[in-house]
Amino acid sequence: MKVMKIGIVIADFYPEIASEMLSEAQNAAKEKGIKVVAVSKVVGAFDIPIALKRILERRDVNAAVVLGAVVQGETSHDEVVAYTSAEKILSLSLQYNKPVGYGVSGPRMTIAQAKARAKEFARRAVEAIFIRQS
């Protein structure tokens, strides 16, 4: 059986959350026998698509996982960032025909909520790359 190889893109705007998410995703991948061949850190969720594109272009990558937290502020900026980023991430997954596990929390989430859900979002993003055939 061929080993699945993935790349991870992590938005590091909230370093404490990002570190926890990355560690959890790497542990989940290891538990499932998945090899992480690339990790790309970007500043924020809006920057994820360009790093994801570079990872999906790699021939040695079968899938990818994107991680980060988009926290609500005083304006609707979090919604714009989250929705725009998610749309581009989905487009790249379809363009390269490779699954992308989406582990970006938000929008409309407090920093406390993002911290509390960091591990769950990361683990589920790794699980999401398995496309079930019916």
Residues covered by each model-derived region:
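Short beta->alpha junction loops
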Residues: 38-46, 106
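Glycine-rich phosphate-binding loop
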Residues: 50-88
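C-terminal binding/interaction regions
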Residues: 78, 85-134
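Amphipathic, non-transmembrane alpha-helical secondary structure
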Residues: 23, 46-53, 57, 116-119, ...
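Glycine-rich phosphate/diphosphate-binding loop of Rossmann-like nucleotide-binding domains
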Residues: 3-41
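Short, ordered loop/turn segments at secondary-structure junctions
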Residues: 12-13, 69-70, 105-108
